[in-house]
Amino acid sequence: GEIAYGKFLWGGKAAFATVEFYRELMNYRRSLPKYQPDEAGSLIMDAVGENGSITIREVRGLLGVKKSAADAAIARLENQTRLVIGDMQRVYRGPDLHYNGWQTASFCRPEDLFDDSPLPPGPFRAFSSEVKARKSPSESLSFLKEHVLRLAPHATERDLTRLLG
């Protein structure tokens, strides 16, 4: 994949980002304490590490929660740059397997989507090279701010903080 899609900008709004910019956002966000996974997030990330991806239905079973709580847990992990949408599949229902426009998403780690390593997702992935930013977290933030200001020169510092976290 060359494009990240998930809820990671403006406090959890859906967005697209190229690998170059997503890696820098990931580098910056993961350096901050407020973007560390909670207990539920850690359980989800362990399951993703073992299986390569996870769906909302699987999160519900794993945590024993309703759909809204599973959606919220996934959205937090997307905002923390821990998960991105890896795949979308159509849902076919009924005896004739009719498609009514419903789709289901699976979520994976950005490292599994963007890493150049030949290893498939799963438990052995821990031994492969992780996606590495080429900058320090503060340099990543500066890089992202400069890019946004080139596109939106009237953006304020407050706007940048709300956008990037």
In which residue ranges do the predicted regions lie?
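Long, low-complexity intrinsically disordered regions
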Residues: 1-165
